[in-house]
Every structure is written in structure tokens, then in C-alpha cells.
Amino acid sequence: MDSLGTPQARQDLLISLNNVGRVVEVRGDWNTAEQIYDEAFGTFRDLADSLGTPESLRDLVVSLGNLAGVVEQLGDTERAESLRAERDRIAKILDSGSSET
């Protein structure tokens, strides 16, 4: 996804990808939803690391929550808990007004 140009263009595409993941999730195709959310999560993380903006961190928090929910449905409780812990850590940073990750 690095070849998509601007960070904003990548972010917009990732939000669309998350929306597709949500549709697949609602249909009960947990494995495909996990693949979609996992791909989006990796790139959201890259964007948050490079931009460090509150918006990029919020997107990462949403992505972590989406992935954690699907992973839990697939039975990997340990990974889901780890993803939620990371989500909560980043959310706390956002709540404190800091953009450090």
C-alpha cells in the first residue's frame, strides 16, 4: 500500500478496507475478516508511526478493536487480549493529549 501516494490517500483506502472487513464480519466470514483487518492494521500502524497525528492514532485504535473482536471469535483469546491491551494503551495516550506511541 506504500505505492498509493499521500498518507491521506492511504488512510482513506484503509478506512474503506475496514468497511469491507465489517461487511465480511457481519456475514460471519471470520477468517476473511481477520485477513482484511490484519492487512489494514499493519498499514494503520505504519501510518501512526510515521504521522503520529491524533487522527492516525484513533484509526489505529479502531483497527485494533476490529481485529481483536474477530480474533476472539476465531478462538484466539490470548491474541485478542493482547490487541485490546495495545488498543487501550494507545487510547490512553490519546486521552492524555500526547501523540507519543
State each model region's role.
Residues M1-R10, R45-L57, I93-S99:
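Flexible helix-coil transition and linker loops at the boundaries of alpha-helical arrays
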